[in-house]
Amino acid sequence: MLEFHADRKRYFDIQVANAEKYVIPFIEEKIRINPGMRVLEIGCGEAGVLKAFINKGCFGMGVELDAPRIEHAKEYLAGDYAAGRIQFISKDIYQVDAEKELGGLYDIIVLKDVIEHIHDQPKLIGWMKNFLKPALSADRPGGVIFFGFPPWYMPYGGHQQMCSSWLKKIPWVHLLPKTIYRWLLKRNKENADAFLEIKETGISIERFEKICGKQGYEIENKAHYLLNPIYEWKFGWRGRKQVGIIKAIPFVRNFFTTCVYYLIKVK
């Protein structure tokens, strides 16, 4: 697993394939993605997800605080970058001016495997209205936001698969009390601060939906996965949606749902 994330080009290629096979079809269940649409990804990394949208004729803008990852993205998308089909900015999203730095508003905003790392998630989710195109008519319904994330209570919701020790094989270990978890991490020479930060920011299905409602959004589409679609490339397991009876049980569903997709829009 660690090797998978360390090989950035392979990870980029997998993100492209996953977005083309799962993310874009999920969005297109509700809106058609047409050439010329503007797509903003917050926390874009190497921009593999954005590449899938560019392949459909969209313009992509990637926001990423980790500048070296943007340099990798520029390398992997050299042709698209040179042609102006994608641009990047390395800046705190709260300091970004939509008109001056992003070139205007967007049809689609993407946060994939990002929201579970964000402090003050209500603030960010509310703030994104500043970058969405407004609804003008039935034919111009306004922008949407896509989220993909692992619920905190799922077997590896603490991202402990990134550990270098035996802890990477232990499901739900991240749910131990903080003091015990910290001791285990330090005992096994892991980066305790990094994994404990995820413990602070992890988000459940119910909390995410509650935040969206309080911030003035409505849910356009959602999919809960028993097997995360990305597992198709990691392990050879095809993405599989959660069974209805589990999906219908609040809180309990978090423990057995490895990934959720949501599409939201302003009410």
What name fits each language-model region?
Residues 94, 115, 153:
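Adenine-nucleotide cofactor-binding loop residues
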Residues 119-131, 137-262:
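S-adenosyl-L-methionine-dependent methyltransferase catalytic module, highlighting the catalytic core
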Residues 67, 118-119:
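A structural helix-start
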Residues 111-112:
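A short beta-strand submotif of the Rossmann-like class I SAM-dependent methyltransferase core
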Residues 11-15, 117, 200:
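Pocket-edge positions in alpha/beta enzyme catalytic cores
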Residues 264-267:
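Active-site beta-strand termini and strand-to-loop segments that position acidic
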Residues 1-104, 108, 125, 255-262:
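Conserved N-terminal segment of class I S-adenosyl-L-methionine
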